[in-house]
Amino acid sequence: NEQEPNEATEIVGGKVETVEVSRHPEASIPETDLSLADIERRRSHPLRWALIILAVLCAIIAPYWFGRSLAVNNTDSIVAVLGGVSPQGIALVGWVAVVIAYVGLAMAVVVSPSWPWLIVFVLGLACEQFIAGLSMLNLNFWYSTYVVYGKQAGLANAANLGIMGAAIGIAVYALVFVGLLVIIRKTSPLNVLTKSWASFILYFVIETIALLVVLFGGLLTTV
C-alpha cells in the first residue's frame, strides 16, 4: 500500500501552495539527560533568589538596629548634626528613601536585566531602615522619640511622618491601580491608564500629594 503524501498548505510568495512535509523531521533540540524538573530548577536560579532574600533581610534588620543604637547611645551627636535642619527637610529625606526603594523594586519587576534595580531597591530599603532606626519608628513612635530626644523629638517625628506618608502613598496607589484593573475594560480607551508608564505617573502623583500633606498639612507641628 502506498502511503499518502504528508502535505500542508502554506502561503509561498503570496500564493497558496501545497508543500510536502517530512514525516520524521530532525529534532531541533539536542538530547539531554536532564528532566523537565531539572531544567526548570536551573531556570529558577535558586541561589540567586536566596542571595536576594538574604540581602533584603540584612537591609531590613541591620540598618534599623544600627540607627536605633546610635539614637540611644549618641543622642547628643545626632542632635548636633541635625539640629540645623528643618523638620520639612527631615521629612523629605524619609519620604525620598521610601520612594527610591519602591521604584527600585517596581523597576526590577518590569525591566530586564533586573539586578541593577534590585541593588537600588536594597540600598533604598537600607537607607529607609537606618532613618527609621534613628527616628525610633514604631506604632507609638512619639513616646519613644520624646524619651530619647526630649525637646528635639520633632526632628525624629518628622522623619517618621515622611516615611509613613510615603508608605501610605504606596498603599493608596496599590488600591487605585487594582481598582482600575478591575473596572476598566481592555477595549476601553481608558485602558491606557493601566500601562506601566501611566501607572508610574499615577504613583508619583499620589506620592507627591502625600508629601505635600506631610509638609504643609500641619502634621509636623501636631506630632
Predicted features and spans:
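Perimembrane loop-to-helix junctions flanking transmembrane segments
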Residues: A71-I90
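Membrane-helix boundary connector in multi-pass membrane proteins
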Residues: V176-W197
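Canonical alpha-helical transmembrane segments
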Residues: G84-V120, L180
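N-terminal juxtamembrane cytosolic/stromal segments of multi-pass membrane proteins
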Residues: N1-V56, A80-L82
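Transmembrane alpha-helical segments of multi-pass membrane proteins
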Residues: I52-V56, S114-M136, K195-I209
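Juxtamembrane boundary at the C-terminal end of a transmembrane helix
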Residues: L211-V223
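Membrane-proximal helix-loop-helix units in multi-pass membrane proteins
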Residues: W117-V182
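Membrane-helix interface motif
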Residues: P63-S77, F130-V148, L219-L220
